[in-house]
């Protein structure tokens, strides 16, 4: 199963890309995608705790433009977006 994770905001800077392509053998939950992103950060940016915190605090959005929680199941090839928290006034 192929999952395309579209990246926005600071996530684009962390991964130096606008999307990541992840492969899995079976259906996964958003929580699994979040954990995989954190695992990648631990390898590439092991000393930067703020990057991991950003992923933990980010929301995920389905292809139907709905915010989905960590228990949302991805059953087949899908596109999902990660939306980091933003600041401003």
Task: Spell out what each predicted region is.
Residues 1-88:
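Ubiquitin-like/PB1-type beta-grasp interaction modules and other compact soluble beta-rich domains
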């Amino acid at each position: 199963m192929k999952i395309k994770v579209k990246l926005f905001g600071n996530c684009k800077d962390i991964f130096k890309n606008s999307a990541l392509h992840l492969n899995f053998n079976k259906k996964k939950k958003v929580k699994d995608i979040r954990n995989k992103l954190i695992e990648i950060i631990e390898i590439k940016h092991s000393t930067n705790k703020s990057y991991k915190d950003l992923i933990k605090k980010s929301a995920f959005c389905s292809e139907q433009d709905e915010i989905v929680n960590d228990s949302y199941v991805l059953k087949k090839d899908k596109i999902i977006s990660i939306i980091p928290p933003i600041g401003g006034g």
